[in-house]
Structures are given as structure tokens and as C-alpha cells.
């Protein structure tokens, strides 16, 4: 299963549609709370995760969620997504396990 975590319903829908057409099992959730519930109960094969879940564009919410996910599922690969990226944020994401 591929887990999509993004507060933007259009992003969740488009990614889900494309992946399902490619025959992947997909679950999509809007935020950290729902994501952690899933990650605790099942190990996704891959996580596609937004970095921002509120109006803040710092990426801190995504980094926090990434660290929480890695506590429960350290071996699950995570791809971080954001419209507000920077080199520093990319480095922080890789250091946190993405």
C-alpha cells in the first residue's frame, strides 16, 4: 500500500488516481493524525508526504511527522513533497530519514 499524506484534496485525488491506474493499493489522508493511525497499524510500502498541513510554509510540520513515522516504521521509504522547498529543508528531510 502507498500512503499519501496531503492536506490538499486535489493533490490526494490526482496522486491516488494515477497510482490506482497503475494497479497500486493506495490510501490517502489529509494530515498527521490520520497518517500516524495508519502507520501504527500497517507498514506502507511507500509514503508520499506533504511538508505543510497549515498556512505555515516552514516545513516543520512535515519534518515532525516524518520523525514520528520513522519511530514506528524506520524502514518505510518516504518521499517528501512541497511547493515551498529549499535546499535547507531538503537536507533536513534527508537527515530525518526521507
Region spans (language model):
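Short, conserved "switch-loop" micro-motifs in signal-transduction and mechanochemical regulators
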Residues: 72, 84-85
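Conserved sequence signature across two-component system core domains
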Residues: 5-6, 29, 47
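The short loop immediately C-terminal to the conserved phospho-acceptor aspartate in CheY-like receiver
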Residues: 8, 52-57, 77
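Conserved phosphotransfer cores of two-component systems
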Residues: 24, 40-42, 68-75, 96
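Two-component/phosphorelay signaling modules centered on CheY-like receiver
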Residues: 9-27, 33
Amino acid at each position: 500500500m502507498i500512503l499519501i499524506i496531503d492536506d490538499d484534496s486535489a493533490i490526494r485525488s490526482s496522486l491516488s488516481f494515477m497510482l490506482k491506474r497503475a494497479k497500486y493499493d493506495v490510501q490517502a489522508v489529509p494530515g498527521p493524525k490520520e497518517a500516524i493511525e495508519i502507520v501504527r497499524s500497517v507498514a506502507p510500502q511507500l509514503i508520499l508526504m506533504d511538508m505543510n498541513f497549515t498556512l505555515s510554509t516552514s516545513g516543520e510540520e512535515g519534518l515532525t511527522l516524518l520523525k514520528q513515522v520513522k519511530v514506528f516504521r524506520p524502514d518505510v521509504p518516504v518521499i517528501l513533497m512541497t511547493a515551498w522547498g529549499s535546499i535547507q529543508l531538503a537536507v533536513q528531510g534527508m537527515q530525518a530519514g526521507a
